Amino acid sequence: MDELLTILQEECAEVIQAVSKCRRFGIDNSYSKGAGSQRENLTTEIGDLQCMIDLCIERGIVEKSAVDLAILNKQAKLKIYSDLYKD
């Protein structure tokens, strides 16, 4: 379990870094020659994070039903406190 949590933590940090670069350089730009776009990097990092989340569920570290409920709760908060769900 320790290895799984360590890698989960690392992937969270990599998503944070990818988001920062999207904001800094623009989502469809690359920040170095030969690198893909920030969007491509963000997509990869989110995929890596989702893999680790799925493993946490599969290994019983968290329950899928509890994660699903947390998602619904977050969506409800976003509808109140953000513009993300507004037309």
What do these predicted regions represent?
Residues 1-46, 50-87:
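Flexible "arm" and connector segments at domain edges
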